[in-house]
Amino acid sequence: MGLIFQPLFWQYVATSYALMVLGFLDETVEKAIKSEGYCSRILRAQGGTRKEGYNEFSMRVEGDPEFYKPGNTYRVTILAVSPAYFRGFTLIALKEGKEGEKEEDHAGSFQIIDEEDTQFMSNCPVAVTESTPRRRTRIQVFWTAPSIGTGCVILKASIVQKKIIYFQDEGSLTKRMCELDLTLEGGNEKTIPDCCACGTAKYRLTFYGNWSEKAHPKDYPRRANHWSAIIGGSHSGEYVLWEYGQASDGVKQVAELGSPVKMEEEIRQKGDEVLTVIKAKAQWPAWQPLNVRAAPSAEFSVDRSRHLMSFLAMMGPSPDWNVGLTSEDLCTKECGWVQKVVQDLIPWDAGTDSGVTYESPNKPTIPQDKIRPLTSLDHPQSPSMTRGGPIIPIARVVIERIARKGEQCNIIPDNVDDIVADLVTEEKDEDDTPETCIYSNWSPWSACSSATCDKGKRMRQRMLKAQLDLSVPCPDTQDFEPCMGPGCSDDEASTCMMSEWITWSPCSASCGMGIEVRERYVKQFPEDGSLCKVPTEETEKCIVNEECEPSSCIVTEWAEWEECSATCRMGMKKRHRMIKMTPADGSMCKADTTEVEKCMMPECHTIPCVLSPWSEWSDCSVTCGKGTRTRQRMLKSPSELGDCNEELELKQVEKCMLPECPISCELTEWSYWSECNKSCGKGHMIRTRMITMEPQFGGAVCPETVQRKKCRLRKCQKSSGNERRHLKDAREKRRSEKIKEDSDGEQYPVCKMKPWTAWTECTKFCGGGIQERFMTVKKRFKSSQFTSCKDKKEIRACNVHPC
């Protein structure tokens, strides 16, 4: 009886399943006829029973945002809480208040992630549905938000669990999001919520430029079109790199010159408010296939206090137009880290230059405007798209989580690593290997013992090389840890899809013992963006010709090739290996340890030399008189790619003249004091100095040039006639001696002098001046020895009274 019943049962199941599939197909055809190309409310089980599914089914948008950013891409997930499941679904996005009867009622667009699981509806191309009616617990698609001005959007999902049971338009299957007003100060929600995630996360930012003549033909600049270097950072909510408000000096320099230097200084000055400075290379030209194949990218990290990221890049040439993200939150409300952000970027104006076309001359905006998005309603000469229509994105940024570090605090594990961590009840103690035990390094972990999606264990080994103290036991040479098998179903978000093992490589040794390797690769990474921990390489010992010749040596495998020596056209690259064991006979190892080969890089693309305008002249280098002033300009195109002359003038210097500097009075040093003008009694003596430079242009006036002081040699005494005669003779004697000295030691007068001239006029009317008089030679006498006489000069003070 049981044998008869079993085939009948399976026949009934197969028949029911076929009827269910036919029901779906009939329903799809019927709706296709009625919809006439548009989507009305689509029910996948019109005659079935509608139930409440608040506790079993839900639709989630990654990050659970209340607002959407125009052009941003979001991951949408429909979930069934175990043990519930569903077989079919429909997902649409409608403008608020619309029923989907017209094509323009729908908002944004969906992107298929897994074509084996989801597809666009044949009778409603803007909606997403299942590919096959099988059991499932989750599906995921990407939804790209509509352009600016769309307003609020409602995502609606319908769930078919069985042929006669469906769920639709309930709170958990409906998500309402409104457009974020980018013109508001800050461009984000009023407040940034605190982050509750644990540990850190590492992300990779990849920038895809789509600014090409084909996509944006109006006034496209064929010369020197480029993207500047990307500059940004991961930061806290206390710091804003840029926002839809006033541009900082760093933003202005990026927007006008494409230089990230000032912006990087501003970021680094914020200290602990910034975790990572994000930098990526510039792109010359702005679009080429290489930019898509090897798009500029940069890696950065976030943590609980610095969970926001911002960046910007200039499109050049342009007045001050840029693209970028500001304060993008990578922390989720579930205390985890966002897996992926994909956003199309539209240009924005920094508000520092009033130019309206790509190559408008510099026209500073005074006073400076606020940063604002470019729209199709800007100046008629602006290269914006169709007037009044949407702005076509000119770039796309993809931010992907590539690693998580530290203890994570997600409530629900979302990858194999998290599940394995739950299996370990106690952390292993630190390595307590005794110093007397010498081991080899641990081998790689073996494959998990479970071939299915179940708990298992894996093993690694090491060899005991030496036991220095036999009384001290050495720990085990094998180590085990729990693991999850690689056979998890496609519904597991953390499953890695692996290829088959590739055949074993040749043995690494030409003789004796070596190693052979086999590899496999990751065909598909987990949906949640976590890293695959499944081993991709296995090694095994191998023996070739058990006895090696004495002169042979053992070398390691070749290392990876180094980077090409050239950035374009022909270059050279190297790789190295090391000698593991020299020949047993002591001879030199003849194996090559370095290998060189040619490498070909993309064609060298030179670009026109692009210079910024000359800056204003600097102030004169002096405050008066003659000096110099300078002005500068910057090289905007990378020197390694441009055809700029190395001797290109980037700095100019010219002379400048300011009013004459004041010149103060200058004098000689004081002369020695003269002799006292009296031989006895009270007298005085003087000293003088000369003016070498009169004061000019308001300089300091000249001080006194004559100083006098009192002198007294001895008291004068009354003398008798003989004494007076004696004094007279003494004076005559001194006079004759003086004449002798003046005539270079002649014993007798050899010349006749003219009388003294009159005193010259005083050099000053007051404050001390000087007078001079002169005595010249009248006649010279000749003798057997030729001698000569000297002219004489006397100086005295005059007008010494104060002015």
Curated annotation (Swiss-Prot):
Residues 436-489, 495-549, 552-605, 608-662, 664-717, 750-802 form the TSP type-1 domain. GO terms for biological process: cell adhesion. Residues 1-23 form the signal peptide. Transmembrane segments: none annotated. It is found in: Secreted, Extracellular space, Extracellular matrix. The keyword Signal applies. Ca(2+) binds at D320, D349, D353. Disulfide bonds join C39-C124, C152-C178, C195-C331, C196-C335, C198-C409, C437-C474, C448-C483, C453-C488, C496-C532, C507-C511, C542-C548, C553-C589, C564-C568, C599-C604. SUPFAM superfamilies: TSP-1 type 1 repeat. Residues 191-383 form the Spondin domain. Pfam families: Reeler, Spond_N, TSP1_spondin, TSP_1. The keyword tRNA-binding does not apply. Residues 354-365 have a biased composition (Polar residues). Keywords: Cell adhesion, Disulfide bond, Extracellular matrix, Glycoprotein, Metal-binding, Repeat, Secreted, Signal. Glycans are attached at N210, N677. CDD domains: Reeler. Residues 24-190 form the Reelin domain. One of its GO terms (cellular component) is extracellular region. Residues 353-389, 722-741 are annotated as: Disordered. Promotes the attachment of spinal cord and sensory neuron cells and the outgrowth of neurites in vitro. May contribute to the growth and guidance of axons in both the spinal cord and the PNS. This is Spondin-1. It comes from Xenopus laevis.
